[in-house]
Amino acid sequence: MGGTAAFICTSLAVIICVVWCQAQSGMRSYGPVFEEQPAHTLFPEGSAEEKVTLTCRARANPPATYRWKMNGTELKMGPDSRYRLVAGDLVISNPVKAKDAGSYQCVATNARGTVVSREASLRFGFLQEFSAEERDPVKITEGWGVMFTCSPPPHYPALSYRWLLNEFPNFIPADGRRFVSQTTGNLYIAKTEASDLGNYSCFATSHIDFITKSVFSKFSQLSLAAEDARQYAPSIKAKFPADTYALTGQMVTLECFAFGNPVPQIKWRKLDGSQTSKWLSSEPLLHIQNVDFEDEGTYECEAENIKGRDTYQGRIIIHAQPDWLDVITDTEADIGSDLRWSCVASGKPRPAVRWLRDGQPLASQNRIEVSGGELRFSKLVLEDSGMYQCVAENKHGTVYASAELTVQALAPDFRLNPVKRLIPAARSGKVIIPCQPRAAPKATVLWTKGTELLTNSSRVTITADGTLILQNISKSDEGKYTCFAENFMGKANSTGILSVRDATKITLAPSSADINVGENLTLQCHASHDPTMDLTFTWSLDDFPIDLDKSEGHYRRASVKEAVGDLAIVNAQLKHSGRYTCTAQTVVDSTSESATLTVRGPPGPPGGVVVRDIGDTTVQLSWSRGFDNHSPIARYSIEARTLLSNKWKQMRTNPVNIEGNAETAQVVNLIPWMDYEFRVLASNILGVGEPSLPSSKIRTKEAAPTVAPSGLGGGGGAPNELIINWTPTLRDYQNGDGFGYILSFRKKGTQGWLTARVPHAESLHYVYRNESIGPYTPFEVKIKAYNRKGEGPESLTAIVYSAEEEPKVAPFRVTAKAVLSSEMDVSWEPVEQGDMTGVLLGYEIRYWKDGDKEEAADRVRTAGLVTSAHVTGLNPNTKYHVSVRAYNRAGAGPPSPSTNITTTKPPPRRPPGNISWTLTGSTVTIKWDPVVAQADESAVTGYKMLYRQDSHSAPTLYLASKSRIDIPVPEDFTHAFVQIRVTGPGGDGTPAEVHIVRNSGTSMMVEDSVTRPVPHAAIITTNSLAMVALIRYLEL
């Protein structure tokens, strides 16, 4: 007994001290919680920065103090030490690799306990110079591949590499023919060319934060032996490792580069899966972003040219750093109770978990059991309080989780949770009265009514947690109820008064119903209740409460009367099927009634779509039935989509019509070597239901091509060339990997066929060169496709002509006639088609001023077989030389003999002036001063007049040989616009415009300048002869 009493006294003293200290501080005390922890740091050797700072800051009350460990040993701080503590940060002055490289850990402590931070490494970055030794020259046959070894100097961390050609900064670009490995730094040239001659140097760069350092090697000379460059199959030289390890979330880069002539094309594939959107492929490099375990597997790179192919395979193996799935949290536990804590971490390899208490390793002892990720306490004591950490680690990293354990010893206290003072209860109902004092250890609870001690009976229940439950309540149960609580720390009680009210009853319950999708329904619910209390109604569907404000308009209250709780269901959907419960409740009781609503509609989505028996054009699909939604399923349909389109398309099946009791069908007429997803839809008399989830992606098997390439044609090019063009075959029709084209061609009229294989699906032309090919020679050409599974059908034979030759014959009898001051007509006799070695496209007219060279001539081309042309844009009163040439796709032929023309003088620039008009009955007479041509102008042969009633009507042209004209006007004439201009050999002159308004009398416009047109309208009015003339000079 003496030991127990001493323990209780010690516990009371600790509790009183803790409570008093908290009251004095005004806030709860707690152990250190890290807000900033040290991070891995890379310090560049030779940096101008003279210190390194490792950060550490913890939230704690009282504030934490800090210590630091290096490689597990505590660092000593002092005024003369290179280590300083600034708040919680560790500052290392003049860091040196030999002394300071290592692992650092921050330790934070206050009165509540101690925690340690994650470990952070301090490493030193460096890059030494390349070796000073001269590098051997390299000699290779032109057309063959070559590799230059970088052999970088010692360094940390990894470098980036480029190569110099002859001098800085002439860097070699990565252009498909040349490749620089960022793993080794080596330079690869797939096929050497004459332009590759020169001296090569490896240029290595280190990037550490904002500090960049570069070094370059001695130059190595490349010389080429000139020979006829023969073609050869690819050979992969730059390879990614056989096993590439990566952590989840990282980006993986695989390198693959091959020698070959022609330069090989690189393709990537995953042998045990398909390409994903995370792939970024740029031929020699495959980048996979944000890798996960699904990216693990075997990858293949393929190098291919027209001479063959080479492949290489390697695996990507994905590991993961530790990551918490379940961690400990701050816990308050009663003295004498048991506690189990668990920490669970994921990672690959699987992490090991260890435990720390106040920064020190924790092992099993007495009441404490440590078992991997579990920590168990039996019969907690106050001394178990403190800071605990679980640490999960594998070879890729370490994670820490921290929590504070507070062991409590408290006398019962009702101040936070007293028994409710007034406890209303419904007659014949049930009442629950909690008793929840704060106490540690848990208190023993007794209940009394007045002075009567309550015990369990048919109507009275006291639960293990001290809650009092009274059932079948009557008026006699009213009175005072008191809860008494006691533990070894003390005792307390709390009292409430029970008041009995009338029970709530549902007088009209909802009825079950069946409806179709889209219909409306009202579920009825009426109730009676104690008039001294408010009544409310709530509804639930399958025990989930219905929120009328968030029902998208499908639910609403059907009445505002207090005793009526009817629920209106609007535009019912399948999701509205289920068991509806109406609950009428007051503050003291509630009562419920339920009914079932069945909503019939289209079937639900089928489940579990599985693809099997995959062929080249067929697959077998199976699925499981979905909900029929209370209407039998009549039939199924199957849809699919490919990697080429996101649009779902209905597929043909076997059987054609899939009955509603089926759970499997064959999909036919698929495209070979195509990635597909499938989904299944069910339908009944009410419509087509939602589709199933897509199946997993599959790829149909490969097959030989079944369609010949289209768009076969060609022609053009250089002399002695036959160019054959076609439309590249779409992915839909390639049917397999290794796709390409086989061309067959021969001179028309000969027997033997020449063939050529053109790899790559995107190819679209082939050039055949031979000195024996004459110009515009017809060839018979056929094409078919091939892939790894075989060859497809040949196309129909097309006629393609070799390159054309410029016409050898010139047009003749060329004539040119000046039409106006700036225009001429040219005509000629055509060349004979038989004289052409190509297709005549038309004729080219060249014209140049007398005194200019023919090379400066302007040119106009006609299309087709026309033998005349109208040329505009000439200078007036100018002599021109004109010649004509025939042209085709190869160019223009020889010129015809040139002919000469001289354009006429321009028309008079001055418009007609002193215009007057007289309106008499249905005729308007217009007069003007004659225009006299100047010496540099063409003669005046007459006048043109454009007459229109308004700005929207079509004009009428009148011709006059003299300076007056009579124009008939309609009886309803109100006004008109008239333009007058001179005409002659040089064309039409500048117009004058008159606006005529109907009225008796005359009107006149007098020109005020010889050289300038009137800029504004002039309006002239007289008394009874109201006359208006609106005159403007406009150029048509």
From Swiss-Prot:
Compartment annotation: Cell membrane
InterPro entries membership: Contactin-1_2_Ig1, FN3_dom, FN3_sf, Ig-like_dom, Ig-like_dom_sf, Ig-like_fold, Ig_I-set, Ig_sub
Residues covered by the Ig-like C2-type domain: 32-123, 128-223, 234-317, 322-406, 412-499, 504-598
Glycosylation (residues): N71, N199, N456, N472, N493, N520, N770, N900, N914
GO molecular function terms listed in the Swiss-Prot or TrEMBL record: cell adhesion molecule binding; cell-cell adhesion mediator activity
Membrane topology term: Lipid-anchor; GPI-anchor
Residue span of region Disordered: 889-915
SMART domains, A to Z: FN3, IG, IGc2
Assigned keywords, A-Z: Cell adhesion, Cell membrane, Disulfide bond, Glycoprotein, GPI-anchor, Immunoglobulin domain, Lipoprotein, Membrane, Repeat, Signal
Region (Hinge): 599-608
GO cellular component: axon; plasma membrane; side of membrane
Major place of residence: membrane
Protein name as it appears in the record: Contactin-2
Organism the protein comes from: Gallus gallus (Chicken)
Taxonomic classification: Eukaryota, Metazoa, Chordata, Craniata, Vertebrata
Gene coding for it: CNTN2
